[in-house]
A protein has these predicted regions:
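S-adenosyl-L-methionine
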Residues: 1-16, 31, 53-82
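Conserved short alpha-helix immediately C-terminal to the canonical SAM/SAH-binding motif I
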Residues: 26, 50-51
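Conserved class I S-adenosyl-L-methionine
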Residues: 16-25
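Short SAM/SAH-binding signature in class I
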Residues: 84-92
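Conserved SAM-binding loop of SAM-dependent methyltransferases across substrates and taxa
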Residues: 26-39
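Class I S-adenosyl-L-methionine
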Residues: 2, 96-225
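Conserved SAM-binding motif I beta-strand of class I
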Residues: 41-46
Length: 225
C-alpha cells in the first residue's frame, strides 16, 4: 500500500511506460505500478546503501526481479540509453536537489518522454531551472498528507515562459485554485502576517518584501484587499 503522495505521482505515469524511479527508497512506487500492470518494467535507483538494500529485498519479496532492476547509482546515472526509459519519477526531495540531479544527468534525458517531479520544497527554484533548460510543465497537482502539502510537476521537453506568479504558485495550480492550493497558501499567508508583525515599522524595505508576498497570495486566491 503506497502513500497518497505516491499514488498521485503514480497517476501521472502513462500506461506501458518503462520507468526510472530516482531515490526509490523501498521501491514502493515501481512495485505498485508493476503489480497493477500499469508499466512494463522499471529501474529503482538509489544512491545510499541502506535504502538500496531495502529496495532489493522488497523487490525480491514481491517476486519482481524480472521486472524491476534495483541499481546503486547517483541520480540519472542509474540508467543508460539502452534501457529505453520513457518516464522518470523523482519524488520526496528538495526542489534544488531535483534540479541538480536533472542538471547532472541532462545528457541522458534526450529520449525520455516525461518527468514526474514531486519536490518537498523550493518548487519555485525547480520551475526556474526547468524554464532555463527548455523543459515545459504540462500538468500540476497538489495534495495534503500528514499536515504537509506536496506539489507534483509533470514535465516534458519544450519551451515555456513563466511569470513571477507562475514560478511561485505554479502555472496550472494557480489557475485551478484547488482546495489544497487554497489551504497551503492561506497557511503561508498567516506565517507571513506573523513575521510582518515582528518587523519594526521603521524597517520599511524589509516590511515591503513581506507585504508584497502577502498581496501576491491574496491576488492568486482572489481575496479582496
Amino acid at each position: 500500500m503506497i502513500s497518497k503522495r505516491l499514488e498521485l505521482v503514480a497517476s501521472f505515469v502513462p500506461q506501458g511506460a518503462i520507468l526510472l524511479d530516482v531515490g526509490s527508497d523501498h521501491a514502493y512506487l515501481p512495485i505498485d505500478l508493476v503489480e497493477r500492470g500499469k508499466i512494463e518494467s522499471a529501474i529503482a535507483g538509489e544512491v545510499v546503501e541502506g535504502p538500496y538494500q531495502s529496495a532489493v529485498k522488497n523487490v525480491e519479496a514481491h517476486s519482481l526481479k524480472e521486472k524491476i532492476q534495483v541499481r546503486l547509482a547517483n541520480g540519472l546515472a542509474a540508467f543508460e540509453e539502452s534501457d529505453q526509459v520513457s518516464v522518470i519519477t523523482i519524488a520526496g526531495m528538495g526542489g534544488r536537489l531535483i534540479a541538480r540531479i536533472l542538471e547532472e544527468g541532462l545528457d541522458n534525458l534526450a529520449n525520455v518522454e516525461r518527468l514526474i517531479l514531486q519536490p518537498n520544497n523550493r518548487e519555485d527554484d525547480l520551475r526556474i531551472w526547468l524554464q532555463e533548460n527548455e523543459f515545459q510543465i504540462v500538468a500540476e497537482s497538489i495534495l495534503e498528507e500528514a499536515g504537509k502539502f506536496y506539489e507534483i510537476l509533470v514535465v516534458k521537453a519544450g519551451q515555456m515562459k513563466l511569470s513571477a506568479s507562475d514560478v511561485r504558485f505554479g502555472p496550472f495550480l494557480s489557475k485551478e485554485v484547488s482546495p489544497f492550493f487554497v489551504q497551503k497558501w492561506q497557511k503561508e499567508a498567516v506565517k507571513l502576517e506573523f513575521a510582518l508583525g515582528q518587523i519594526p515599522e521603521k524597517n520599511l524595505e524589509e516590511r515591503q518584501v513581506l507585504v508584497d508576498k502577502i498581496q501576491a497570495i491574496k491576488e492568486v486566491l482572489h481575496v479582496s484587499k
